[in-house]
Each structure stands twice: as C-alpha cells, then as structure tokens.
Amino acid sequence: TRDEVARAILKEQLNGKKVYIDLRHLGIEKIKQKLPSLHNAALMQSGVDISEELLEIKPVAHYTMGGINTDINTKTNIENLFACGECADVSVHGANRLGGNSLLEGAVFGELAGKKAKEYAFNREFLPIDYSVVIKNMDLVQRIFDGDCTKNFNAMRISVGKIMFDKAGIFRNEVSLQEAFDYMKYLRLESNTLHCIDKGKHNNVELISILELRNALELSEAIILSAMKRCESRGAHYREDFPFTLKEGNAHVLIKELQKGFFKVHYEE
C-alpha cells in the first residue's frame, strides 16, 4: 500500500540513494494514452521523457486521515453544520485511504451532505448570528492590515512544510514529534507579527495567505498532538518507537482546541 511504499522510498533516500520509477516498457503510445498528464508533467517540470528515461521519485503528503468529526449523515456537533469531502472524517477509510477511493467522500457523502442539509434547513429556524464572533474575526483581519511586516512570510510557510515532513511525517517518534510541536508553537507566536504589505481590501491574496498559514499552524499542532497520543503504528501513522499495532488502538483520536493554543486530546471508540 502507499504508506509502505512511501516508507521504503524514504528509507533509501535517507541512506543517500535515489529511487526511480521505470515506465519505459510501456512505450510512448500507451503512455500518451494512459498517462498523458504524468508524461507532460515530467517533461515540463523535470525535462524527463518517461517513455525513454527513468523518473526520480520521492514521497510527498497526499491525504490526511482525519478531519472534522461527523456522523454517518455528515452532521457535526455544531448545529446546522454539515461536512463532507476531504475536510471531514466520516471514518470510511480508516488509517489508510487506498488509491482510487477518493470519490467516495466527494461524490457519495457530498450528495448526502447536500440532501441532509436541505432536510434540516426546511425543519429549522435560522440561528441568530453571534456578532461577537464576527467582530473578533474582523479585529483579527484589521490587525493583519495594521503595522509593517518585518517577517519573511514565504520562509515561514516553507519551514512549516519542512518541519512537518521531517519531524511529523512518514517516520515519527516521541523526540521528533516534540521538536515539531515546540517549533509550531514558536511559529504560531511569530505568525502574530505577520502583516500585509498590500493594504488593499479587495481580493487581497496576501491576506488570504496569512490566514491560511495561521490555520495551517493550528492544524499542524493538532496533527502532532494526535500522533503523540497514538502510541502505536497504524496505516500511514508510523511510530519508529512503537512499530506495532495495538488491538485496543482501533479507535479515534479526537482533538478539540479549548482556547487558543490549548487542546483536549482523547480516544473515542
């Protein structure tokens, strides 16, 4: 499966070796027919013609086993909120989604979420708007606009991905996870000093990027804490210090942010 292949590839690369995929036996006609996007991407990005050359490969993040906790009808614990697709965890894939199965979440549960939300809306009054939440988020946006930016946003964004891959990615252990968590806490504080250079209020891509980075840091902390809680290996979650799978580990790790930077983590059958 993908997680086993990813570990095997990375293990070779950590030992200084390169790993390649060989598609030359397929021939140019079959490659253009069956793998046109891969053929074009390899040519454009790496200058490699996969019908004649080996293509160097490496593992990357593909899918997150987890998401917003929902029931089988896509309902969340927040009234009037339904979730589907890759933002949600309806628990159909377990610890490792296999290739070709992504349509289940998007098509099947996407349709179900729409139907259930419609049924629910017809039988409910709209909840009153909590303007305190609106004002809180408006204040956050205004703080991002105010002030001069002295931090390198791109460097911070790149470091998030690198640390998460190196310390909390394919191979994990208690030490690496703690190091990743400490660094994310540091970056989360640093992200408060990010401000927009572009002060325009209309379609401000810089503002969106800063908000996305703040969300990514919050999510990274949640992923790390969940990985620290699960003292076993299961699917794509591989702990070098706990390489075995526990029978009693067949349960969800649920995480909830009680307030900024403070999480509650627990198992739920």
What are these regions (language model features)?
Residues 1-53, 116-122, 162:
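An anion/pyrophosphate-binding glycine-rich loop and adjacent beta-alpha core
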Residues 36, 41-82:
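FAD/FMN-dependent oxidoreductases across multiple families
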Residues 8-14, 63, 69-83, 87-269:
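Glycine- and aromatic-enriched mobile tails/lids
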